[in-house]
């Protein structure tokens, strides 16, 4: 496989597949980049440490601060304690959350990614019902509907009458 093909394959894989968590996988949030493909992460247990990015992701996928990754711990490291297994996009975060495997310490970040939060529809009420202006009663709505129907009936009567307009496409002019 050429380098361009590998890059295209990894980019498509990250963007189109849902990741299934293994038992030893840890979800972590990227805090900062240390350089040389090393990143400082905060994991679901509250520990902060450095992880490495494998060769397959280098120059193909870019990490940003506060983005979520799946980390697989490695035993042979003093400073580097894990390797990035998968980079989670928004769809994967919501998928893992639906499965019930999303850590509770990152729940606030996952809630911001939901459709309801993006549309501005929150589950909890931010404005009390007492603070809202009073709504119109149903009686007023019934009266306004009757008025609209009366107006509509008057319009129908005028439609039945013939118009005295001249149509140049007719042979004769209308008689008055």
Swiss-Prot record:
Listed Gene3D superfamilies: Nucleic acid-binding proteins
One of the record's GO cellular component terms: nucleus
Sequence ranges assigned to domain S1-like in this UniProt record: 5-89
Biased composition (Basic and acidic residues): 117-128
Residues that span the membrane, as ranges: none
Skewed-composition ranges (Acidic residues): 129-164
Domain of life, source organism: Eukaryota
Annotated spans, Disordered: 117-176
Comp. bias regions, Polar residues: 166-176
Molecular function (Gene Ontology), one example: translation initiation factor activity
Keywords: RNA-binding
Pfam families: eIF-1a
Family stated for the protein in its record: Belongs to the EIF1AD family.
Protein name, as recorded: Probable RNA-binding protein EIF1AD
Organism: Caenorhabditis briggsae
């Amino acid at each position: 496989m050429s380098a361009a093909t590998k890059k295209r394959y990894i980019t498509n894989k990250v963007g189109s597949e849902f990741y299934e968590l293994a038992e030893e996988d840890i979800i972590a949030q990227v805090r900062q980049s240390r350089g040389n493909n090393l990143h400082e992460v905060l994991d679901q247990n509250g520990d902060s440490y450095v992880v490495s990015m494998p060769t397959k992701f280098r120059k193909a996928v870019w990490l940003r601060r506060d983005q979520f990754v799946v980390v697989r711990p490695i035993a042979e490291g003093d400073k580097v304690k894990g390797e990035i297994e998968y980079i989670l996009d928004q769809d994967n975060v919501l998928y893992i959350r639906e499965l019930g495997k999303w850590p509770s310490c990152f729940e606030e970040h996952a809630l911001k990614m939901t459709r309801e939060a993006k549309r501005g529809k929150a589950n909890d009420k931010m404005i009390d019902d007492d603070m809202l202006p009073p709504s119109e009663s149903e009686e007023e709505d019934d009266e306004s509907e009757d008025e609209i129907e009366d107006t509509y009936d008057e319009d129908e009567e005028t439609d039945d009458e013939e118009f005295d307009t001249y149509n140049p496409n007719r042979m004769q002019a209308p008689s008055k």
